[in-house]
Amino acid sequence: MSLKKALDDCMIDFDRCVLVTDLLEEYKLSYKEVNDVLEAYIKEQEPATKFEKRFLVHGKRKTQGSDSGEDLYSVVLESRMQDWLAKVQDAESQLYSVKIAGGTKAPAAIFKPMQHLEVKLAKVEQRPGAGKIVPSANGTTPHNGVKSEPTKSEPSKSAVKLEPSKSSLKSEPAKSKAEKPVASKSSPEDKKTSPKEQASKAKPAAAKKGSINSFFTAAASKPKDVKATPSKSTSGTVDNFFKKQPAGAKKSPPESEDKSKKDASNSNKKEASKKKSPSPTKKPTTANTSMQLFDEESAESSDEEEKLDMLRRKVIESDNDSDQEKASSSKRRRISDSEDEEQPPKKSADEETIALDEKMDTEPANETYLDEDGFVITQRKPTKAQPANKKVSPKAAAPVNKKKSPPSAAKAGKDAPKTKQAGIMNFFSKK
């Protein structure tokens, strides 16, 4: 994009200070071309808008002790340019920056380095991959919103760089696909040899496990051979014994349950001893002898067991009925006993109140006696017994204490020895 087109399309914002050096850097033009285009644009816009211009003044200033003056460069406003030209010898002025007078935006930096011209003057070629490093002018873009042409060519470079990476990605899957069939070919050979190797590896492992768990495996295998269907009948009889008991039987005293269990065990032992003598066959011994007894009985005589089960059920049902009656009667007895136990405390409390009232009437409230020194002492009744009297009979106890306690009793009570008070307190606490 040319500078003239950018100015016509209002791509350059003059609210900020537009430096000529920026335009030289962006559009790669000579100073004369930029100056001519910019002055022509300002003349067109000047009747409507007022611009604030700055000029670069260059000249020589005389100093003491030197015939040739020093070079002086200064950026000056247009209003002060004539004064500076008069002060300096061989003065030259060039347009440096343009800005709309009274712009709302913050001012941009006045001085900026010109990398493009520095490279040209030093005759140094810039590295192709190096990007432009231009300081930002108060948060604004260095080119004043105008995009340079070389930046457009960057996407093409990146696309060219990405192409070899795509080809490498394509080549990698091809390699992986080529490796997969090789692995698949080798896998059947491994599968063919694997069962033999696994068998050879499994044998020592099994031997080790057998040495550790031989005891448990042997013990587990024997009961499996010995236990047959008749064992279910024995377990069923035990389960029926507990299942057929109603809810009331649980509440029956534990003594009746213990007696029934003992009777059942004794009857089983007697039957087993009778049936052991005629049995000619011998079965292999097992770890659990009690289970063996039940197995022999069930295997030899199944009909007799059924009869015995019927008898047991009848006995259990009769026991359950009696247990229910006993439980109901025991409940009633417990209720009556609890009522009897609750009543005596009430009677005892009433008796205690009557006894206390009698003591209050019979015994005097104050005791008068002579001390060892010959002083007359009146002992007042202890104050700790008053709350009990108030709880039992407040109306009867209060007036007795008020009537019989003279004012002198309080004074005398303080002088009484502690041993005598302790003896009286013990007397009332015991009763």
UniProtKB/Swiss-Prot annotation:
Low complexity composition-biased segments: 156-171, 278-290, 387-411
Gene Ontology BP terms: DNA repair; DNA synthesis involved in double-strand break repair via homologous recombination; double-strand break repair via break-induced replication; double-strand break repair via homologous recombination; mitotic DNA replication; protein-containing complex localization
Tissue specificity remark: Expressed in ovaries (at the protein level). Expressed in ovaries.
Record's compositionally biased regions (Basic and acidic residues): 172-200, 252-271, 308-328, 343-362
Biased composition (Acidic residues): 294-307
Phenotype when the gene is knocked out: Oocytes and embryos lacking maternal PolD3, show no nuclear localization of the delta complex members PolD1 and PolD2, resulting in limited genome replication during the earliest cell cycles and thus early developmental arrest. Mutants, presumably with maternal but not zygotic PolD3, develop normally however adults display a variable degree of bristle loss or shortening, and females are sterile while males are fertile. In larval salivary glands, the delta complex localizes normally to the nuclei and chromosomes display a significant decrease in homologous recombination repair.
UniProt keyword annotations, A-Z: DNA damage, DNA repair, DNA replication, Nucleus
Highest taxon of source: Eukaryota
Cellular localization per UniProt: Nucleus; Nucleus, Nucleoplasm
GO MF term list: DNA polymerase processivity factor activity
Residue ranges, annotated region (Disordered): 128-431
Segments of this protein annotated with the region Necessary for function, possibly resulting from its inability to interact with PolD2: 64-80
Subunit comment: Component of both the DNA polymerase delta and DNA polymerase zeta complexes. The DNA polymerase delta complex consists of three subunits: the catalytic subunit PolD1 and two accessory subunits PolD2/Pol31 and PolD3/Pol32. Within the delta complex, interacts with both PolD1 and PolD2. Component of the DNA polymerase zeta complex consisting of four subunits: the catalytic subunit PolZ1 and three accessory subunits PolZ2/Rev7, PolD2/Pol31 and PolD3/Pol32.
Protein name in UniProt: DNA polymerase delta subunit 3
The encoding gene: PolD3
